[in-house]
């Protein structure tokens, strides 16, 4: 018991000393060494029965009592690590915080706030550019969606490597993404414009068919967060109509592929009208081709030709 009291006082003092450095990475590296040293001491000369109480002392004094302070440190705190994509340091932080009951709750609180704040910056920058126009440009939509996709891609990487795919961390990221995406009232329109820019004939995106499918898949990952899917449908229908009427659709296959993705997310009823528009256009083209074929076979020519879609 006396030995435990000595170790308890030692680690309380050690925590105070380490906190003065205000360097989270140094703090956690030191904590990691202390865990290893206690394990080696027990293996060498102490009873295995002392492992649990000693472990509790080190975890409580070095971690549990200072979680928020460690996370908020200006050098190596979680926000700094996320900004600099310091994945090894984040992995150490996750691994140690996971040892104590409230560790991941504290980490996820900061993670959630970080993602929300960075998302708000994306929103504010884009919405400031579009505030004086009722119809945002494709460039604005592309900028917003690309920034959101880049953010999600980076966070997915952090989740997989640093946070070991932890479900609670994934939930924190998703909650924050959901929050800031839906704070942008133009998100449904931006996503539809982004898709339109990729499916329109003549754009640099539509001409590269091998790269198109992965882009559409990534777009769906953002679409999932949108609450106002009826608003998105309205814009998507308008943009699809414009592509079809102006003969600007890159390909029927690409259009149907995108609609199939929306169907998986929202069901048949959601895409029924969109599928109907494509089917009507295809039928119109087939009837027109058959008509011209008949004219050619009969050697008949018309003084005036019109294409009506």
How would you name each of these model-derived features?
Residues 1-3, 8-309:
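Eukaryotic scaffold/interaction segments
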């Amino acid at each position: 018991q006396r030995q435990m009291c000595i170790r308890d006082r030692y680690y309380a003092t050690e925590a105070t000393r380490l906190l003065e450095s205000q360097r989270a990475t140094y703090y956690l590296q030191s904590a990691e060494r202390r865990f290893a040293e206690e394990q080696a001491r027990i293996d060498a000369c102490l009873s295995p029965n002392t492992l649990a109480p000693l472990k509790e002392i080190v975890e409580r004094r070095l971690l549990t009592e200072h979680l928020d302070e460690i996370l908020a440190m200006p050098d190596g705190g979680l926000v700094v690590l996320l900004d600099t994509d310091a994945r090894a340091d984040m992995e150490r932080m996750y691994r140690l915080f996971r040892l104590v009951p409230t560790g991941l709750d504290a980490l996820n609180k900061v993670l959630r706030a970080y993602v929300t704040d960075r998302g708000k910056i994306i929103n504010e920058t884009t919405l400031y550019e579009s505030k004086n126009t009722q119809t945002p440009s494709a460039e604005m939509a592309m900028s917003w969606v690309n920034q959101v996709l880049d953010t999600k891609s980076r966070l997915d990487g952090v989740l997989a490597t640093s946070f070991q795919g932890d479900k609670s961390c994934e939930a924190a990221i998703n909650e924050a993404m959901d929050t800031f995406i839906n704070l942008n009232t133009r998100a449904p329109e931006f996503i539809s414009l982004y898709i339109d820019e990729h499916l329109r004939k003549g754009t640099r995106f539509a001409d590269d068919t091998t790269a198109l499918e992965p882009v559409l898949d990534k777009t769906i990952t953002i679409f999932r967060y949108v609450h106002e899917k009826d608003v998105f449908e309205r814009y998507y229908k308008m943009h699809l109509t414009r592509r079809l009427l102006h003969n600007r659709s890159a390909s029927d296959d690409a259009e149907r592929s995108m609609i199939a993705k929306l169907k998986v997310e929202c069901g048949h009823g959601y895409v029924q009208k969109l599928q109907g528009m494509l089917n009507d256009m295809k039928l119109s083209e087939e009837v027109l081709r058959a008509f011209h074929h008949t004219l050619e076979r009969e050697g008949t020519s018309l003084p005036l030709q019109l294409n009506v879609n």
